[in-house]
Amino acid sequence: MSARCQITGRTVGFGKAVSHSHRRTRRRWPPNIQLKAYYLPSEDRRIKVRVSAQGIKVIDRDGHRGRRRAARAGSAPAHFARQAGSSLRTAAIL
């Protein structure tokens, strides 16, 4: 499974770890991806979304209406906006 948040689009970060002697080794910073279930009262069902900790905060803060407005305005990630008719998008924009 890919390490990508379905809400924010956050993905793996790359860089280098620098030791005390300034040796640099490549490393990666994976996002904090959680599998979260949300209940959709309009469809009377639960769906599962792979979302980062920041994405959970976004859903808690904005709710489904705020996330829907962001997707329409173009501030949502491209993969999120393409799924306009899918149930995944419906779930992600609680």
Swiss-Prot record:
Feature: compositional bias, Low complexity: 72-82
A Gene Ontology biological process term: translation
Annotated GO MF terms: structural constituent of ribosome
GO CC, alphabetical: ribonucleoprotein complex; ribosome
Chain positions covered by the region annotation Disordered: 63-94
InterPro entries referenced in this protein's UniProt entry, alphabetically: Ribosomal_bL28, Ribosomal_bL28/bL31-like_sf, Ribosomal_bL28_bact-type, Ribosomal_bL28_sf
Domain of life: Bacteria
Biased composition (Polar residues): 84-94
Alphabetical UniProt keywords: Ribonucleoprotein, Ribosomal protein
UniProt xrefs under HAMAP family: Ribosomal_bL28 (MF_00373)
Family of this protein: Belongs to the bacterial ribosomal protein bL28 family.
The protein, known as: Large ribosomal subunit protein bL28A
Organism: Mycobacterium bovis (strain ATCC BAA-935 / AF2122/97)
Taxon lineage: Bacteria, Bacillati, Actinomycetota, Actinomycetes, Mycobacteriales
Gene that this polypeptide is encoded by: rpmB1
